[in-house]
C-alpha cells in the first residue's frame, strides 16, 4: 500500500514470484491452515472408525475424508510433494515420509471418488436442513477442479473426466446462476442460493472467527461504515488501472469499494488513493 501497510518482505516476495523457503506467509499456509486441518480430519476419521456405530457413520466419515482430500488438494497444488499421512497421531521419532505430487494427486482423486459414493445427492436432501454440508455434487465439483490440472500434477491430461464431473452436477438441474453476481454472497442466502454448490458457514455472532476473508479484504475504517465488531486489517486492494478495466455499469463494481465512502451517520471519509499497490 502507498501508506506503507503490509509492506513486508513476505508479501513482496509473493508479488514478485521470488519466494524463499522461510517466507512467513507460506509458513502460515502450511503450518496454521492446511496441515492442522488435515490432522484434525485424521483424528475425527479415526475416532468414528473406532466407534461401535461405525456403520451408521459412513456418510460422516466420507464427508470428513472429502474435507481432508480438499486440504491435500491445496497442499499438492501449492507445494507439490508433501508428507502424506492419514493416521490420528504422529510419532515424533518417525515423521511421515514425503510423497510425490503424483502420489498425492492419486490419493486426492481416490478419496474424493470414494467419498462421493457415500454422500447424498443434493436431490436427496432437504436443502435448508442439510446446508452447508457436502453433497455428491460438491465433491464432483472439487474433482473437476483437480482434473483440470491433472497434466501438471500427474503428467497426464484428464479433460474427459472434467466434463464428466461437471455433467454430474449440471445433470441434477438443481443449480442455476443467480440474477446478480453479488447475490451469491448475501448474508441471508444461506441455503437459498441456487448457484452455491458448496460453502463454509460462518456464524456472524462469532465476529471474524472462521471468516478471515472479510477481515483482510476491507479497509480499517469500514468498521465504522458497517458498524463491525472488529477492525478490518486494511489488507487487499487494487490499482486504479485494475479498476478501469471494468466498464461502466458492470454489476461486479457493486462488490468493490472505491471512491468516497461514508460512515453510517452520513459523515464522509475518503479512501486513500493507491497508485502502486498489490
Q: Which residues are covered by each model-predicted region?
A:
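Short, surface-exposed recognition loops and adjoining beta-strand edges that mediate ligand/DNA contacts
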Residues: 1-5, 85, 120-141, 148-220
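Conserved, well-structured interaction surfaces
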Residues: 4-79, 95-106, 112-126, 278
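Proline-centered turn/helix-capping motifs that create local helix->coil transitions or kinks
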Residues: 5-6, 75-84, 206-207, 262-265
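Elongated scaffold/linker segments in the mid-to-C-terminal portions of large proteins
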Residues: 9-31, 168-278
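A structural signal for well-ordered alpha-helical segments within the folded catalytic domains
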Residues: 35, 39, 106, 137-142, ...
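Hydrophobic face of amphipathic alpha-helices that form TPR/SEL1-like repeat modules
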Residues: 72, 146-147
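Short coil/linker segments at helix-helix boundaries
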Residues: 80-106, 153-160
Amino acid at each position: 500500500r502507498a501508506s506503507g501497510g503490509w509492506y513486508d518482505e513476505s508479501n513482496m516476495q509473493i508479488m514478485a514470484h521470488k519466494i524463499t523457503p522461510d517466507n512467513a506467509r507460506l509458513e502460515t499456509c502450511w503450518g496454521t491452515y492446511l496441515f492442522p486441518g488435515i490432522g484434525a480430519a485424521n483424528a475425527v476419521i479415526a475416532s468414528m472408525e473406532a466407534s461401535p456405530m461405525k456403520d451408521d457413520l459412513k456418510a460422516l466419515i466420507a464427508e470428513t475424508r472429502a474435507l481432508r482430500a480438499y486440504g491435500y488438494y491445496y497442499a499438492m497444488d501449492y507445494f507439490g510433494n508433501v508428507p502424506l499421512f492419514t493416521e490420528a497421531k504422529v510419532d515424533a521419532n518417525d515423521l511421515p515420509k514425503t510423497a510425490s505430487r503424483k502420489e498425492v494427486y492419486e490419493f486426492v482423486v481416490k478419496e474424493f471418488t470414494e467419498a462421493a459414493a457415500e454422500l447424498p445427492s443434493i436431490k436427496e436432501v432437504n436443502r435448508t436442513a442439510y446446508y452447508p454440508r457436502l453433497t455428491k455434487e460438491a465433491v464432483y465439483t472439487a474433482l473437476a477442479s483437480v482434473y483440470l490440472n491433472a497434466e501438471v500434477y500427474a503428467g497426464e491430461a484428464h479433460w474427459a473426466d472434467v466434463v464428466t464431473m461437471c455433467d454430474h452436477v449440471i445433470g441434477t438441474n438443481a443449480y442455476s446462476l443467480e440474477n446478480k453476481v453479488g447475490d451469491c454472497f448475501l448474508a441471508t442466502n444461506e441455503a437459498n442460493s441456487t448457484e452455491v454448490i458448496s460453502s463454509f458457514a460462518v456464524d456472524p455472532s462469532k465476529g471474524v472467527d472462521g471468516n478471515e476473508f472479510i477481515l483482510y479484504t476491507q479497509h480499517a475504517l469500514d468498521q465504522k461504515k458497517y458498524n463491525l465488531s472488529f477492525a478490518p486489517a486494511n489488507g487487499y486492494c487494487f490499482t486504479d488501472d485494475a479498476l478501469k478495466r471494468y466498464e461502466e455499469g458492470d454489476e461486479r463494481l457493486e462488490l468493490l469499494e472505491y471512491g468516497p465512502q461514508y460512515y453510517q451517520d452520513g459523515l464522509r471519509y475518503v479512501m486513500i488513493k493507491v497508485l502502486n499497490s498489490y
